[in-house]
Amino acid sequence: MKELVLKYGCNPNQKPAKIYMENGSELPIKVLCGNPGYINLLDALNGWQLVSELKKVSNLPAATSFKHVSPAGAAIGLELDEVLKKIYWVDDLTLSPLASAYARARGADRMSSFGDFIALSDICDKETALLIKREVSDGVIAPGFCDEALEILKAKKNGKYNIIQIDENYTPDDIEKKQVFGITFEQGHNNLDINKSLLENIVTKNKNLPEDKKLDLLISLIILKYTQSNSVCYVKDGQAIGIGAGQQSRIHCTRLAGNKADNWFLRQAKCVLDLPFKDGIKRADRDNAIDVYIGDNSVEELLSDGMWEHLFTKRPSEFTREEKKEWLKNLSGVCLGSDAFFPFSDNIERAKRSGVEYIAQPGGSLRDDAVIECCDKYNMTMAFTGIRLFHH
């Protein structure tokens, strides 16, 4: 297949639309089912690059959950504990390493992952297909699909689920192009190899950087490489727990991603795990209710008479601000990556509140000394990578 004609571009009025290889060669993808759209394909191709790099750095299967050309989550295939299985709604499933990777990628920020495009580093197995089957998703890209997985996925969305197979040996040209307003932009493909050498320049007094934290920092940097800038990523135990994408202020990235990380951890509190949902309440409705319950804005409405009865068998007790603050003190060992330098130490102060102990960022700010001093105040370990990771 040398070109794929699309229904339309970013929006329905943007016609005609297609993808093709500029040199006239075959596309490195095959559409096995469905009719993927312009944004679906942007998500698929960015997501595939991300999971390929995660697998390379970890030697484990990897998955990502993409929405609007940024990852909502990404992870490697580490086994889940019972609490994570419960908050990800997978405690009733048998999980392969690849399925565990997607459960983590989808589960960290389920509100953002609703209607995602999935990328898998490995051949999709039956266990992963069964997990995908029951989630609201636009499609999946992988290097292959076992027969059972393909049969399961082809039945999704009444046979219209987007399934894309990519040639895992494909490599792009060194030079890439795109057009904006009729003007062609040309640049070298971002083939930066993210590896442990980027973490050697530790600038804080605390030089301790365990191997598992090095891996988490590398995961954060790979995620940032394929996230719309400005971006910041919090990672713990092989998975993103908070991604702040596409913000024009660094501190807003750090706050947004930190708030997502906080929500991930708040969902693990006993009062949230024990919420008395009625039988038959769908996962998406549970996700929405939990998001409100752990938030500060609309919880009174959720728990008001005439409202809680729609979701719960009995009225839950409020999760107070003081209780949430106390619970969040238990979050620790978090790694943080930033796609550009921190201009002010307020980013470090905010990161500390979400359990961050290890940081990787380019460095190069006029206020690097103040940022390092703030890290030293909290005994954090910070590496200057010297590499910016903007993505647009």
Residue ranges and their predicted role:
Residues 1-198, 213-231:
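Active-site loops and adjacent core secondary-structure elements that bind or stabilize anionic groups
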Residues 23-35, 108-114, 190-207, 285-307, ...:
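Gly-rich Lys/Arg/Thr-decorated short loops/hinges at beta-loop-alpha junctions or inter-strand turns
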Residues 53, 226, 263-267, 353, ...:
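Conserved helix-loop functional segments at active or binding sites
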Residues 57-65, 164-166, 229-236, 266-277, ...:
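Flexible, glycine/charged-enriched surface loops at secondary-structure junctions
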Residues 70, 124, 236-239, 247, ...:
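Active-site-proximal loop/turn and secondary-structure-junction residues that shape catalytic pockets
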Residues 72-110, 241-341:
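Glycine- and Gly-Pro-enriched alpha-helical subdomains that act as flexible
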Residues 116, 120-121, 134-164, 169-171, ...:
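C-terminal binding/interaction regions
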Residues 174-209, 267-288, 299:
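Substrate-contacting helices/loops that form the catalytic groove of nucleic-acid
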